[in-house]
Amino acid sequence: MKGNEILALLDEPACEHNHKQKSGCSAPKPGATAAGCAFDGAQITLLPIADVAHLVHGPIGCAGSSWDNRGSASSGPTLNRLGFTTDLNEQDVIMGRGERRLFHAVRHIVTRYHPAAVFIYNTCVPAMEGDDLEAVCQAAQTATGVPVIAIDAAGFYGSKNLGNRPAGDVMVKRVIGQREPAPWPESTLFAPEQRHDIGLIGEFNIAGEFWHIQPLLDELGIRVLGSLSGDGRFAEIQTMHRAQANMLVCSRALINVARALEQRYGTPWFEGSFYGIRATSDALRQLAALLGDDDLRQRTEALIAREEQAAELALQPWREQLRGRKALLYTGGVKSWSVVSALQDLGMTVVATGTRKSTEEDKQRIRELMGEEAVMLEEGNARTLLDVVYRYQADLMIAGGRNMYTAYKARLPFLDINQEREHAFAGYQGIVTLARQLCQTINSPIWPQTHSRAPWR
């Protein structure tokens, strides 16, 4: 990828950063990719597409150190759980065998595993060596008859967040728009004017949480044409250009896809969240409004009233235990505000939230939820997090796995909220699961013991 192409990806017109006196998202600084490179960002964005073979072209470490670190669930194929790599070594680089190894790897994968498509991820070594991925992809596609698509996001291009952009850009240019959607089944109970097709962008089905939302959409006569990329299928993503509306779930990752689909196909979109009762209801209302169906609006309101009543009833045993509790939330992106909303729905107070991967719009939503004086943490080293905990007397820390031992060493209750978690927190059912996990975490009998003297002292 050329330098001007990278700069074009950094300059995102739909991003709130562009309204400031700078061009798009900030360029990476030396050493700033230590927490995740562009390759990692591209791979983690597309890896949930379950029927595609994801082939990493590079040394074994690039695949082995990053594979399957997002807990996206699949309702069907599990080909994406297999790690494929060309395993380039020193001799391959010296002898210039990278392109040949790549071609034979694609042919072997197609012959043995029969994927819907093959995605090839570029990494630093072949990018510096100058391997022509596009030429190899064209030759392999001709030889196998299966779509072979290059994802050019070598690690040294920039940060993990930058890597999301080329992955989405390739989907718009090479995948979406290549197939027409299947007709609605004849057994459907909805009249033609009540049927609506939508697309989901940046929804990754962590721990299967979108399966809490899918039945609600089915009940309303809303079909998800394609999801980019949670529980996704290659053929379904190809049909997303026919969606009547798109919902953007994580703006930092794939806002360029939502903007491009609006420009190319006129598809309206909005950014929403399924974390918490209020956010889920708002998302359903916004979908109904974008689809412009008065009957759908009425049915949506009836469904929301029913689900909110059921959720409130299920939350009663947990609310008293959580009301007034203080939490430090250190995450990023859409979760920096959407989880705040969910915790407030439970009667909790968020003393501070992390904004390391948040956009300006995310920060504005945080201020709307927490007030203008909201504490936002750009950096989250252990000392900073614990200082906030002690200053505001937080009852627990809610963050990603890398902060777990910071909390445990401070004898502080900890709940994992990031992509590695095993529990689904989205939707009306998810908020009940979140409340249960919070109560079990805070009320664990281990915490009083950690603060008491050992019996032999």
Curated annotation (Swiss-Prot):
GO terms for biological process, alphabetical: nitrogen fixation; protein-containing complex assembly
Gene3D superfamilies hit by this protein: Nitrogenase MoFe cofactor biosynthesis protein NifE, C-terminal, Nitrogenase molybdenum iron protein domain
Keywords, sorted A to Z: Nitrogen fixation
Record GO terms (molecular function): nitrogenase activity
Matches recorded under InterPro entries: Nase/OxRdtase_comp1, Nase_comp1_CS, NifE, NifE-like
Pathway entry: Cofactor biosynthesis; Fe-Mo cofactor biosynthesis
SUPFAM superfamilies: Helical backbone' metal receptor
UniProt key word Signal: no
Keyword hit for tRNA-binding: no
Pfam families tied to this protein: Oxidored_nitro
Positions in coiled-coil regions: none
Superkingdom classification of source: Bacteria
Family per similarity comment: Belongs to the NifD/NifK/NifE/NifN family.
Function in brief: This protein may play a role in the biosynthesis of the prosthetic group of nitrogenase (FeMo cofactor).
Protein name (record): Nitrogenase iron-molybdenum cofactor biosynthesis protein NifE
Organism the protein comes from: Klebsiella pneumoniae
Biological classification of the source: Bacteria, Pseudomonadati, Pseudomonadota, Gammaproteobacteria, Enterobacterales
